UniProtKB/Swiss-Prot annotation:
Binds 2 potassium ions per subunit. Its cofactor is K(+). The modification Cysteine sulfenic acid (-SOH) is found at residue 281. This is Betaine aldehyde dehydrogenase. The gene is betB.
Length: 486
C-alpha cells in the first residue's frame, strides 16, 4: 500500500517520523493509504520552506500572482473528474456531488480571488498643505489552514485562495480522516508556477494542529471544524497573538411558513439535511413548519425521503453516501437511538444500511423525527449525519424566539411568498449565513461565517481579504521638521 506524507518546498516529502496512520474508504472499510504523521522536524522544514516561499511570492506583483492562480484554476477544472473520484474514495460522498460541487466551487473561489488580487489597494488622504498619509495592505506572512473532513479539497482551496492572493504563504493541515486531495492541490499549485514553499501540506492528527497554533512564525490560523476544537485552537493561538478565523458547527433553523411553495420547501429540507449524508455544518437540521401545512409537509417529506438512493458512492445514481468513519457512524446511530427514546415520533429511517453489499461501509438511512420539542437532545446537539428534526410552530414571534434558542448561529433559512415577512424574520435570526426560498448556495462572492459558537471571521467575499492582510499607515511630511527642542 502506498505511503503518503507531506508536501514541502514544492515536492513530496516523506518526513522524519516513523509514525504513520491509515486512511480508509468509508464505503467499504478498505485501506486507501498509509500516511506519515508529522513531527517537529517536519513542521520546522515546512516553516523554513514557507519563509523562503513567502519572500519570493510577496515580492511579486499582484498581477503576476493572479496569473499563476488562474493557471491553477484551469488545471483544477481540467482534472475535475480525477480529483472528484479521489475525494469520493476518501470521504464516502456520492460522485454526483463531488463531480459538480467540490472541485468546481473551490476553483471558483480561487478564480474570484485571482481577480481581486490586482485591485487590492490602500487609501491616501491629505491632512494639510505639507502632510498626507497613505496606507498599504500588506500580507501577514505564513498562514496556517486547518481543514475538516467533509469537504477536504474545497476547504483547502477556500483557505488558500485569499491567503495566496494577498501574498501570504500557507501551511495546510488536512484532517487525518481525509489527507489525500490536499496533496493533489499542492501539486497543481506547483505545476501552475507557484514558488516552492508557498503552499505546503503537513499531515497528522491534533498534535500537528497544536504545533501550528503554537509556532511563533505562524501569523494567522484559519480553522474549520467543531466548536469545542475551535475553542482549543483559539486558546492555543492566543499565546502568540495570532489572528484567528474559524468556521465551526451549527444547528441551523429552517422556517417554513404556511404560504411557502410546499414542493420547494420539502426539497430544501431534504437538501439541508441529507446532502453529503448530513455531514455539512450549515445544514438546517431544525425544520420549523407552520401548523397550517404541517401534516401535508410531513406526508410529502416521508414519501420523498424514502425514495432517496443509498448506495455505492461511485454509482452515479447514488444520492446518499457513507459516513466518514465507523466511529462517526456509531455516534450518529447513538443519537438516533436517543431520539427514539424521546417523545419525538420516528417518521422514517433510523437504522444502519446493511443490504445490497453495504454492510462493510458506514451507511445510515436518511432519518426524520417529527413532533420534536426544542429541548430534546437531538434537536439541540449537532449530530452531523442524515437526521432531520421537524418542529411545529404557530406564529412569527414564537418561531423567531425558538429558532434563536441555540448556542449556534451559523445558518438559517425562511420559506414564504411574503417577501416583507421573509426579510423581517431573517433580520431577527441570529445567524451569519441566511437564505430566503433556497438553501445551501455559497457563491465565491458571498462572505460566509457564523455568529455565537459557530465561528469568528468570514470566508469568501471581499471581506475575507481583511483577514489575510495588515494595514501599514505611512505619514509623509513635505516641509521642514518643526522640532520642539532647540
Amino acid at each position: 500500500m502506498d505511503m503518503k506524507a507531506h508536501y514541502i518546498d514544492g515536492a513530496m516529502h516523506l518526513g522524519c517520523s516513523e509514525e504513520h496512520f491509515t486512511t480508509y474508504n468509508p464505503a467499504n472499510g478498505e485501506p486507501l493509504a498509509n500516511v506519515k504523521q508529522a513531527n517537529q522536524q517536519d513542521m520546522q522544514a515546512a516553516i523554513e520552506s514557507a519563509k523562503r516561499g513567502f519572500a519570493i511570492w510577496s515580492a511579486m506583483t499582484a498581477t503576476e500572482r493572479s496569473r499563476i492562480l488562474l493557471k491553477a484554476v484551469a488545471l483544477l477544472r481540467e482534472r475535475n473528474d480525477e480529483l472528484a473520484a479521489l475525494e469520493v474514495a476518501d470521504t464516502g460522498k456520492p460522485i454526483q456531488e463531488a463531480n459538480c460541487v467540490d472541485i468546481a466551487t473551490g476553483a471558483d473561489v480561487i478564480e474570484y480571488y485571482a481577480g481581486l488580487a490586482p485591485s487590492m489597494h490602500g487609501e491616501q488622504q491629505p491632512l494639510n498643505e505639507s502632510q498626507f498619509f497613505y496606507t498599504r495592505r500588506e500580507p501577514l506572512g505564513i498562514c496556517a489552514g486547518i481543514g475538516a473532513w467533509n469537504y477536504p479539497i474545497q476547504i483547502a482551496m477556500w483557505k488558500s485562495a485569499p491567503a495566496l492572493a494577498a501574498g501570504n504563504a500557507m501551511i495546510f493541515k488536512p484532517s487525518e480522516e481525509t489527507p489525500l486531495t490536499a496533496l493533489k492541490l499542492a501539486e497543481i499549485y506547483s505545476e501552475a508556477g507557484l514558488p516552492d514553499g508557498v503552499f505546503n501540506v503537513i499531515q497528522g492528527d491534533y498534535r500537528v494542529g497544536q504545533m501550528l497554533t503554537a509556532h511563533p512564525d505562524i501569523a494567522k490560523v484559519s480553522f474549520t471544524g467543531e466548536s469545542g476544537t475551535g475553542k482549543v485552537v483559539m486558546g492555543d493561538s492566543a499565546a502568540t497573538l495570532k489572528q484567528v478565523t474559524m468556521e465551526l458547527g451549527g444547528k441551523s433553523p429552517m422556517i417554513i411558513f404556511d404560504d411557502a411553495k410546499l414542493d420547494d420547501a420539502v426539497s430544501a429540507a431534504m437538501v439541508a439535511n441529507f446532502y453529503t449524508q448530513g455531514e455539512v455544518c450549515t445544514h438546517g437540521t431544525r425544520v420549523f413548519v407552520h401548523e397550517g401545512i404541517y401534516d401535508e409537509f410531513v406526508v410529502q417529506l416521508k414519501k420523498r425521503t424514502e425514495l432517496l438512493v443509498v448506495g455505492d458512492p461511485l454509482d452515479e445514481q447514488t444520492q446518499i453516501g457513507a459516513l466518514i468513519s465507523k466511529e462517526h457512524e456509531s455516534k450518529v446511530l447513538s443519537a438516533i437511538e436517543q431520539a427514539k427514546a424521546s417523545k419525538a415520533t420516528l417518521l422514517t429511517g433510523g437504522y444502519k444500511v446493511t443490504e445490497n453489499g453495504l454492510a462493510s461501509g458506514n451507511f445510515v438511512v436518511p432519518t426524520v423525527f417529527i413532533d420534536c420539542e426544542d429541548d430534546m437532545p437531538h434537536v439541540q446537539q449537532e449530530i452531523f449525519g442524515p437526521v432531520m428534526s421537524v418542529l411545529k410552530f404557530s406564529d412569527e414571534d414564537e418561531v423567531i424566539a425558538r429558532a434563536n434558542n441555540t448556542d449556534y448561529g451559523l445558518a438559517a433559512g425562511v420559506f414564504t411568498q411574503n417577501l416583507s415577512r421573509a426579510h423581517r424574520v431573517i433580520h431577527q435570526i441570529q445567524a451569519g449565513i441566511c437564505w430566503i426560498n433556497t438553501w445551501g448556495d455559497s457563491p465565491a462572492e458571498m462572505p460566509v461565517g457564523g455568529y455565537k459558537l459557530s465561528g469568528i471571521g468570514r470566508e469568501n467575499g471581499v471581506e475575507t481579504l481583511t483577514h489575510y492582510t495588515q494595514t501599514k499607515s505611512v505619514l509623509v511630511h513635505l516641509g521642514d521638521f518643526d522640532s520642539p527642542y532647540a
